[in-house]
Every structure is written in structure tokens, then in C-alpha cells.
């Protein structure tokens, strides 16, 4: 069943403009190394922050542990606390690359109140995702879900990029399917879901 869900997600991603090589074309997620030595070295030379430590016992996300992109501590999503912006992306997805500076600008300005977490999803070439993020100045932490293990849950995607908001009370709300153009757009969407001004 999981293979069908992942296959359906892959097909949907292709239909939204990502090429087949952006999606699943190789081994299952369990066989993809998201902390290969070249990725670890690339991350060490960058300003990408370490993956977050556990913050709570049950923050509202499913109990799913994902590896840190480029090496570092694994992240149990259920131990993360909202509010938190969660962006699902792929390295060779043009709208994902275009959106990264807006998310980074939001993280720099409001990350102390509403952090950002990137998830490289359904992507068997995570080194490309890490390199593209670093080239665009991303510093927020990123994890990887190369096999699409999140599909079927609250962080499912039918297209990338897709951005969600985990609220302080544990709700998961979709901010947008597709790329956000600016810091202002990210801020306004977060404020609308939280019901507060940042």
C-alpha cells in the first residue's frame, strides 16, 4: 500500500512540473544516504544549522524519525513543538529553489518565534537538495524523507514545494501548495493561520 501511495505522489509531482528524475527513480528511501561524506563536508562549510533537539513529548506531528540532511542528529517529528513552518521540497524542483530565499528571509526575521524546518522529500539525490539550499543561502535546519515515508499522513504532498504550519496546540495546517514569492507572503500566511501579528 505504501508503494502505491508513494507512486501516486511521484506521478503527481511529475504532473506539476517536476521531471521524473526529480522524483523516485532509484532505490527505496531506506537505501539513500543523506549523510554521505561529501554532503557532511558541504554542510560543515555552510551556515546550515543543526537539526532541532526534542522539545516536547507530543507536539502533534506523527512519531516519525527522519535523518538530518547532510548529517547530524535524527529528528522525531512528534517531539517538535509549534509554531513551526515546515517546507517540503526537492533539490531539482525549480519552484522550490525559487522559494528558498523567501523562507530564509522569514527564518532570519521571525525564526526566534516561528522556526522553519525543511524536509527534502521523495528525493533520491539529496546531495543536490543540500547544495541547492546552501547556494541560495539557506541556514534553517533540514531533514530528509527520501522514500516518502510521510505520505498518507498530515505532511503528505501532491506537489512540491508544499508548506505546512504546526501550531502551538499541535494542529497541522497547509500554508500553501506551490512556491511562495516573498517574505511578505510567508509572513502573511503564517499570521493568518496563527491569528496573530508577528
Protein language model regions, located:
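A generic structural signal for alpha->beta connector loops
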Residues: 82, 113-114, 139-140
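N-terminal targeting signals for export/organelle localization
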Residues: 1-67, 198
